């Protein structure tokens, strides 16, 4: 019997490749350190190139199958639509309006629902072993052993590292590779509102969009819908900006080495800074000194991971291949990490299908195909954060140019 493929991590990339391999009758086991009830309830943006790749790999499923299962507003018959409009969070005025004729090319997805939907997209259950924290990986391509803290030991043909930015596999196989911290400030809050309160407070500003994007003078305050139930709406918000720290000045909100416990605490400097922003409604009604202590607030440290081709070749000789954030992590704000994780899983599964007898060639082919896409995505993600946090004068210039172009288009139409 062919040894199974061992997948470390039950996130989006791990579940996706397990589901595709399982559908192709290729033995595999997923190992996850956490318990089955772990939650990642926030929503992410799935871009057309990401969800199309996934739907095709799962048997040419229709887009409606996905949106019915994962859209934050699915209970209302929604499709995870966002208007992609930008509003001045000081005045509430619309700055950048989307093209009304543009088709929907981004789907918002509740991350918990997406993981469940992927796992359920097949006849045979995916084999997930929870409570398995990796201790070591040893061996070579075709014969590799994974040992876990609970004493379990499994032999497989290949280890797929799908265990995220802080990858245990990578830290063992490539100990010299560590995440780079991006000098940005990101605070993320989660809250729940009764449906009636949401309809009165947020809907008049957002309409049917699942994101209310507010931009300020070098900072952003998006409010996003994570999930809607019959009685409540789960929301999250972000407060983000580039760090101002340098040799002369310390930025009290830039805490790159914050502990897990400290990351859940609200620093007084955050309350003071938000109060100084003079936000318009509805941002001011959620982001204030009275409301924030009632939310679950996290200080997200933004990290990037980059590896060389020599690095992955060395890991390949030890029977390890990387997918998702384990080899190309991007900042949560402005990155497309979830989409690239899905495409990684699809492309590696395609490379492995029918080539179980030549794993080396399959893994090499996967890297040949994915390399440029992923390396360029990491580079772009760093730039995109700063592009999305412009001075207000630049946003005003962009808004004016958009108006002029729209006016010219209207004249040409007549």
Curated annotation (Swiss-Prot):
Keywords: FAD, Flavoprotein, Monooxygenase, Oxidoreductase. InterPro entries: FAD-bd, FAD/NAD-bd_sf. Pathway: Secondary metabolite biosynthesis. Its cofactor is FAD. The keyword Membrane does not apply. This is FAD-dependent monooxygenase adaC. It comes from the Eukaryota. FAD binds at residues 32, 43, 115, 325, 338. It is an enzyme of class 1 (oxidoreductase). Belongs to the paxM FAD-dependent monooxygenase family. Its EC number is 1.14.14.-. FAD-dependent monooxygenase; part of the gene cluster that mediates the biosynthesis of the linear tetracyclic TAN-1612 neuropeptide Y receptor antagonist. The decaketide backbone of TAN-1612 is synthesized by the non-reducing polyketide synthase adaA via condensation of one acetyl-CoA starter unit with 9 malonyl-CoA units. The FAD-dependent monooxygenase adaC then performs hydroxylation at C2 while the polaketide chain is still attached to the NRPKS adaA. SUPFAM superfamilies: FAD/NAD(P)-binding domain (SSF51905). GO terms for molecular function: FAD binding; monooxygenase activity. It catalyses: 3-(2,4-dioxopentyl)-3,6,8,9-tetrahydroxy-1-oxo-1,2,3,4-tetrahydroanthracene-2-carboxyl-[ACP] + NADPH + O2 + H(+) = 3-(2,4-dioxopentyl)-2,3,6,8,9-pentahydroxy-1-oxo-1,2,3,4-tetrahydroanthracene-2-carboxyl-[ACP] + NADP(+) + H2O. It comes from Aspergillus niger. Transmembrane segments: none annotated. The keyword Glycoprotein does not apply.
């Amino acid at each position: 019997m062919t040894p199974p493929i061992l997948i470390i991590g039950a996130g989006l990339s791990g579940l996706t490749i397990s589901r595709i391999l399982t559908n192709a009758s290729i033995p595999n086991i997923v190992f996850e350190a956490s318990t089955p009830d772990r939650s990642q309830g926030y929503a992410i943006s799935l871009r057309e190139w990401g969800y199309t790749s996934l739907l095709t790999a799962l048997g040419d499923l229709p887009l409606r199958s996905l949106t019915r299962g994962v859209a934050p507003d699915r209970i209302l018959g929604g499709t995870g639509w966002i208007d992609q409009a930008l509003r001045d969070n000081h005045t509430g005025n619309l700055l950048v309006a989307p093209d009304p004729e543009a088709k929907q090319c981004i789907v918002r997805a509740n991350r918990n629902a997406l993981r469940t939907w992927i796992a359920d997209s097949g006849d045979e259950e995916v084999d997930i072993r929870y409570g398995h924290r990796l201790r070591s990986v040893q061996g070579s391509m075709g014969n590799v052993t994974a040992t876990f803290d609970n004493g379990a030991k499994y032999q497989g043909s290949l280890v797929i590292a799908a265990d995220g930015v802080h990858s245990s596999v990578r830290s063992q196989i490539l100990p010299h590779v560590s995440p780079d911290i991006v000098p940005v400030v990101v605070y993320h809050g989660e809250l729940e509102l009764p449906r009636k309160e949401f309809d009165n407070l947020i809907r008049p500003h957002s309409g049917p969009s699942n994101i209310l994007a507010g931009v300020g003078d070098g900072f952003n305050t998006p409010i996003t819908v994570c999930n809607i139930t019959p009685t409540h709406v789960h929301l999250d918000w972000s407060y983000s900006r580039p760090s101002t720290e340098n040799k002369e000045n310390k930025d009290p909100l830039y805490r790159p080495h914050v502990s897990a416990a400290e990351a859940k605490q609200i620093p007084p400097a955050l309350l003071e800074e938000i109060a100084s922003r003079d936000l318009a409604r509805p941002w001011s009604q959620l982001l204030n000194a009275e409301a924030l202590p009632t939310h679950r607030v996290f200080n997200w440290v933004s990290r990037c991971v980059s590896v060389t081709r020599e690095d992955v070749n060395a890991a390949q000789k030890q029977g390890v291949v990387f997918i998702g954030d384990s080899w190309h992590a991007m900042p949560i704000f402005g990155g497309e990490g979830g989409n690239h994780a899905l495409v990684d899983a699809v492309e590696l599964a395609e490379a492995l299908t029918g080539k179980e007898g030549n794993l080396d060639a399959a893994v090499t082919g996967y890297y040949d195909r994915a390399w440029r896409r992923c390396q360029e995505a990491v580079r772009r993600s760093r730039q995109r954060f700063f592009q999305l946090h412009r001075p207000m004068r630049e946003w005003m210039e962009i808004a004016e140019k958009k108006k002029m172009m729209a006016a010219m288009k209207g004249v040409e139409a007549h």
